[in-house]
Amino acid sequence: MMSFSVLQVKRLQLELITPAKPTLQETKFLSDIDDQEGLRFQVPVIMCYKDNPSLNKNCNPVKVIREALSRALVYYYPLAGRLKEGPNRKLMVDCNGEGILFVEASADVTLEQLGDKILPPCPLLEEFLFNFPGSDGIIGCPLLLVQVTCLTCGGFILALRVNHTMCDAPGLLLFLTAIAEMARGAHAPSILPVWERELLFSRDPPRITCVHHEYEDVIDHSDGSYASSNQSNMVQRSFYFGAKEMRVLRKQIPPHVISTCSTFDLITACLSKCRTLALKINPKQAVRVSCVVNARGKHHNVRLPLGYYGNAFACPAAFSKAEPLCKNPLGYALELVKKAKATMNEEYLRSVADLLVLRGRPQYSSTGSYLIVSDNTRAGFGDVNFGWGQPVFAGPAKALDLISFYVQHNNNTEDGILVPMCLPSSAMERFQQELESITPEPKEDICNNLRSTSQ
């Protein structure tokens, strides 16, 4: 295994990729779900591909993807624009066709040498997705940054950073799929994009009809250690949940409960309890874990067009004081998670939009007693094929402070779920201990599948 302290990534000139054809010059409003304060950040995604000469012999992935991006932007032209604020900080996109940032790069390393360094939390992310000065803002900045890095083995890494106000994971997947289809020769996306953000505007008059713990102000009984932890003291580690880990967790749940819970529910309950113990949260402190729930599809009765690529989710929160969460069996936390997710329907989403307008777009809590979890295991990033087959890995590149993204991962023996976490260093050690305690056998399986990197 090579030393990554000497990894050489050479980048060429930064480019602006514009739509391949003239597009409408107009201003489009974002929805009231899109422009909430809690989504005004950028999300990094990494996608890693092997060389596949049988599928794309003598083709240059940089050239193919660059051209496909330009053609896809004809259909997704708002992504080539810039955000601006209107009255009351309402976000809108100026569809001016200025383009997205694109950089071509090469690295003197093979995909095999990189090994699990491509997995979240990716310690080499800054090499494969360079943070160009002035590129990471929200207002007036490019909405996408894409870096394609060619490797010596013939494979490549596509890393991108997207402004979350423009799309969620299913929306980003629609755009990536369109690029991939263009790269493979299609003349148009198989699913045409739909803007129609007015579908998720607040009602007239707006009215809050549901309880939204995720936006509530709560009394902070903590000692402030989480908030005072600077970035140099924060670490990220990924925890692997395979068949053995899940079997041990299920044994702790009553049969009538386990029959109606998902793998996501069980992992989230486990994280909620272990994290609360690790942070030594005051017993009286309210603890909230928000589950990102996609509004698309028939299950939640939210009628949106197939090509809608805006944010269409809510984050209902499991709510409890720290003391019962820590002292009760795991089934207690599991019931809270299931109850929170069950509140999600069209009325809940409409109530969120109304709350955001009535209360001036409140931010999600920034205390350590709050966590957001997002299940990306079925997001579909692993199906994006630019002509080199499916990626070895594709998904969010790391956790984001109070946000954890679950991703699918095969550890060479089985498919499991990788969960990156971000915590102060001292709390991370305790979190690992609590996790090993709650899944007492086999300890070695969990320990062998831990990855950590300081951020």
UniProtKB/Swiss-Prot annotation:
EC number: 2.3.1.-
Tissue-specific expression: Expressed at very low levels in the skin of ripe fruit.
InterPro entries for the chain: CAT-like_dom_sf, Plant_acyltransferase
Keywords, comma-separated and alphabetical: Transferase
Keyword Transmembrane helix: no
A GO molecular-function annotation: acyltransferase activity
Keyword Endoplasmic reticulum: no
Catalytic residue list: 164, 385
GO BP annotations listed: alcohol metabolic process; fruit ripening, climacteric
Family: Belongs to the plant acyltransferase family.
PANTHER family according to UniProt: ACYL TRANSFERASE 4, OS05G0315700 PROTEIN
Role of this protein: Involved in the biosynthesis of volatile esters which confer ripe apple fruit flavor. Alcohol acyl transferase that can use a wide range of alcohols as substrate to produce esters.
Miscellaneous field: The fruit of cv. Royal Gala exhibits a high ester accumulation, whereas the cv. Granny Smith contains low ester levels; this influences strongly the ripe apple fruit aroma.
Protein name: Alcohol acyl transferase 1 allele GSb
Organism per entry: Malus domestica
